[in-house]
Amino acid sequence: MQATTQIKTPVVGKHVYGELYGVDEALLKDEERLRKIVIEAAHIAKMHLVEVNSWRFKGGDKEGVSVIALVLESHIAIHTWPVYNFATVDVYTCGEHSDPMTAFRYIVSQLSPKRFTVNYADRSFK
């Protein structure tokens, strides 16, 4: 009888990112609401939240909010440009059990863009 050995990939990296167009300007300025969205996205995607930081920037076309959640598996980030009704979303996870696409879809559902792009990159160690 021959033994079967399963070789595991040492690092499983899943990266989902995209751009959201036509998002409500007031929502893109609402730092507290964006923080709550990121926290819930981490929860439903089976990520372990370590810390959330956010910053509100004021001034013309540079105005916006950035929210970055450090999760045990990696990170979630939202950056907004309210004057353009535009946001970027970045969800990167390491590990087999977390689901960055679920987090991305949740964020999109909460921001309700008129249109969006989504990209996926396998960033696993091979």
Curated annotation (Swiss-Prot):
<keyword id="KW-0210">Decarboxylase</keyword>
<dbReference type="GO" id="GO:0005829">
    <property type="term" value="C:cytosol"/>
</dbReference>
<dbReference type="InterPro" id="IPR027549">
    <property type="entry name" value="ArgDC"/>
</dbReference>
<keyword id="KW-0068">Autocatalytic cleavage</keyword>
<dbReference type="GO" id="GO:0004014">
    <property type="term" value="F:adenosylmethionine decarboxylase activity"/>
</dbReference>
<dbReference type="InterPro" id="IPR003826">
    <property type="entry name" value="AdoMetDC_fam_prok"/>
</dbReference>
<feature type="active site" description="Proton donor; for catalytic activity">
    <location>
        <position position="94"/>
    </location>
</feature>
<feature type="site" description="Cleavage (non-hydrolytic); by autolysis">
    <location>
        <begin position="73"/>
        <end position="74"/>
    </location>
</feature>
<keyword id="KW-0456">Lyase</keyword>
<keyword id="KW-0704">Schiff base</keyword>
<keyword id="KW-0865">Zymogen</keyword>
<comment type="subunit">
    <text>Heterooctamer of four alpha and four beta chains arranged as a tetramer of alpha/beta heterodimers.</text>
</comment>
<dbReference type="InterPro" id="IPR016067">
    <property type="entry name" value="S-AdoMet_deCO2ase_core"/>
</dbReference>
<dbReference type="GO" id="GO:0008295">
    <property type="term" value="P:spermidine biosynthetic process"/>
</dbReference>
<keyword id="KW-0620">Polyamine biosynthesis</keyword>
<comment type="pathway">
    <text>Amine and polyamine biosynthesis; agmatine biosynthesis; agmatine from L-arginine: step 1/1.</text>
</comment>
<dbReference type="Pfam" id="PF02675">
    <property type="entry name" value="AdoMet_dc"/>
</dbReference>
<dbReference type="GO" id="GO:0006527">
    <property type="term" value="P:arginine catabolic process"/>
</dbReference>
<comment type="similarity">
    <text>Belongs to the prokaryotic AdoMetDC family. Type 1 subfamily.</text>
</comment>
<protein>
    <recommendedName>
        <fullName>Arginine decarboxylase proenzyme</fullName>
        <ecNumber>4.1.1.19</ecNumber>
    </recommendedName>
</protein>
<feature type="active site" description="Proton acceptor; for processing activity">
    <location>
        <position position="79"/>
    </location>
</feature>
<dbReference type="GO" id="GO:0008792">
    <property type="term" value="F:arginine decarboxylase activity"/>
</dbReference>
<feature type="modified residue" description="Pyruvic acid (Ser); by autocatalysis">
    <location>
        <position position="74"/>
    </location>
</feature>
<dbReference type="InterPro" id="IPR017716">
    <property type="entry name" value="S-AdoMet_deCOase_pro-enz"/>
</dbReference>
<comment type="function">
    <text>Specifically catalyzes the decarboxylation of L-arginine to agmatine. Has no S-adenosylmethionine decarboxylase (AdoMetDC) activity.</text>
</comment>
<keyword id="KW-0670">Pyruvate</keyword>
<feature type="active site" description="Schiff-base intermediate with substrate; via pyruvic acid">
    <location>
        <position position="74"/>
    </location>
</feature>
